[in-house]
Structures are given as C-alpha cells and as structure tokens.
Amino acid sequence: MTFGLDTSVVLRLLTGQPQDLAAKALERYQDGIAAGDDFSVSDLVAAESYYAIQHHYGKSKEEALDALRSFSSGDGISFSQNFEAAINTPNIHKASPGFVDRMLVSGYGETGQITLSCEKLFRRLLGTEVIS
C-alpha cells in the first residue's frame, strides 16, 4: 500500500521531536517498510516541512534542505520530480528564487502551465511570466 505523509509525520521523522510521537512515527514507518509499503511526500508537505524546520526548530535553510534531501533517499520514500529538480539545484540554500519557488514553477510546468508572478526574480526561471 502507498501512504501519503502529512507534514506532522515528516517533521517527527526529521526532527525526532517530540520524542514519544517521533518514536511512534518511526516505528510506523519501519513497520510499513517491512510490510512492503511505500510512502510519498507531496510538494506542499515538502514546502511546509522546509519552512517549519527553519521557523520552529531554528535550523538554517541549508540544514532544512539537507534533512529533506537525506529523507528523500530513504527506503520506500518518494518525492515528486519537482522536488528532486529543486533540491538538486546547485547551492539551492543560497539560490534566488529559492527551493519552494523552483518546486512551484516546475510543478506548473509539468502540466504545461506558465507560472505568472509579480516577483521579478522569477525572470531567472524558464516557464514564467512576470507582471511588472
């Protein structure tokens, strides 16, 4: 069976906090892997986790991205191609537009849409139109 992970589960697995709930989340994940289950993480959950790790856990962009990158290579875990493209951008922790913006543009592009934005930095990305 395939399960879509909520942000609350991803954060428990990435941070280990709070310990009791993180232990239960890890046990459920490990039991699922042993049973042959797969787990997917949506772009929205990846974005929420990225911001939450920084805001609530005091980690840097680079640390948040490293945690997500490491998690994405775990057994039975799948992220979207948009996530993979964004997270593997060289120096993504310093990039502008950043990780979430790149995931967004890639997601729209995947369905043939052009991203319409008022952010001038979006001109740096293919598949965008900037209103200015």
Predicted regions and their residues:
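Acidic catalytic patch
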Residues: S40-L44, D66-K94
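Alpha-helix capping/helix-boundary segments
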Residues: V9, V45, A85, M103-L104, ...
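Residues that scaffold the ATP/ADP-binding catalytic core of kinase and kinase-like folds
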Residues: R12-L14, A52, L125
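Active-site-proximal, substrate-binding regions of enzyme catalytic domains
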Residues: Y50-G76
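A general alpha-helix detector
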Residues: V9-V10, E48-A52, S70, N88
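Acidic, PIN/NYN-like endoribonuclease modules and their adjacent C-terminal/linker elements
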Residues: V105-S132
